[in-house]
Regions:
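Secondary-structure junction motif
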Residues: 176, 190-211, 278-287, 292-301
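Short helix-boundary/capping micro-motifs
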Residues: 11-28
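A short LG(V/I)-centered, amphipathic sequence patch enriched
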Residues: 40-59
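Beta-alpha-beta core module
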Residues: 152-159, 163, 178, 225-274
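Conserved amphipathic alpha-helical core elements
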Residues: 39-40, 113
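A late-sequence structural motif
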Residues: 105, 255-298
């Protein structure tokens, strides 16, 4: 077994066929087929099933793929550790997170990061927790800023901030005259919430269950930027992070209220693959988050 065979095996899985893998690696289909046959012969098990020009992983293949990811990640880390020094001249950093985090918290961090490291190429991907975690595990994203908790047996998680969730409504809503609401005020009130599956939605659902609120969820959205205009026109109220409505509150287009006696918070954390050595661009943004996070407005005045 050699690295080239593992590279071919991984390319087949990612490309979906021997033909596409050959195109990606610039080798013939027959050469790839021959190497996979040798690999399976050496392992003594079948790792790929061929059917109608498609390939599927066997259980042994799934195990091998997991270790392939680890092997190539370790090699990449080794090369980085050997070649990098403390001065970043060039490189890239891939960041992922939820829409509210990427819209309202991350820009301040990235502006300062770019000022300090202008030659680092930055890529930002938005998504809910599960897709972002999958991208981190597949080495498609270097770092995620996610609502905690997350399943972390293979990940490094550093809690960075706790932000308050508030009830948000149109200024014309009957509840908008108050700065604090009781739990009972939420009973049967039309709610527009984040979609199921997001960690922020889970926090809200747990609060609803614990307080025995009769929830009237009329809509669910994946994007806070869609939720806000629906609330603005009076379709319902919502529960979202305060940081996402700072501008609207200042402009008077949305009103917010706390829940009396039951403040609702979500914790955000930095999520990365466990590794012996963090690439310098990744080290720098972790440090920057810790430096700047206290300067960001995430709690109501």
């Amino acid at each position: 077994m050699d690295l080239r065979q593992l590279e071919m095996f991984q390319a087949i899985v990612e490309a979906g066929s021997f033909t596409n893998a050959g195109k990606r690696l610039h080798v013939s289909q027959s050469a790839i087929s021959r190497q996979i046959t040798l690999l399976e012969k050496e392992l003594g098990v079948q790792v790929l099933m061929r059917s109608n020009k498609r390939v599927f992983l066997t259980d042994a293949g799934k195990t091998l793929l997991k270790h392939c990811h680890r092997v190539f990640r370790d090699i990449e880390e080794a090369l980085l550790e050997v070649s990098q020094n403390e001065t970043i001249s060039e490189g890239s950093l891939r960041v992922g997170g939820g829409m509210s985090v990427c819209t309202y918290l991350l820009p301040h961090i990235l502006k300062e990061y770019h000022a300090r490291h202008p030659n680092i190429r930055l890529t930002v991907t938005t998504g809910t927790s599960e897709p972002t975690l999958e991208k981190i595990r597949n080495n498609e994203i270097d770092i995620g800023i996610l609502t905690l908790p997350v399943e972390s047996h293979d990940l490094e998680v550093e809690s960075i901030i706790e932000e308050e969730m508030v009830v948000v409504m149109s200024p014309s809503h009957p509840l908008s005259t108050r700065k604090e609401l009781s739990v009972k005020d939420l009973d049967e009130t039309p709610l527009i919430l984040f979609e199921r599956g997001s960690n922020t939605r889970k926090i809200i659902e747990r609060f609803i269950d614990e307080q025995d609120i009769t929830a009237n969820i009329i809509m669910q959205m994946e994007n806070v930027e869609i939720i806000k205009p629906l609330v603005d026109i009076g379709l319902g109220i919502t529960i979202i992070p305060y940081q996402s409505i700072v501008r609207e509150v200042e402009a008077g287009t949305l009103h917010y209220a706390r829940i009396a006696g039951h403040p609702l918070y979500r914790k955000l954390g930095l999520v990365m693959l466990k590794m012996n050595y963090r690439p310098i661009p990744l080290q720098r943004i972790v440090t920057l988050f810790k430096e700047m996070i206290s300067t960001l407005q995430v709690l109501p005045p």
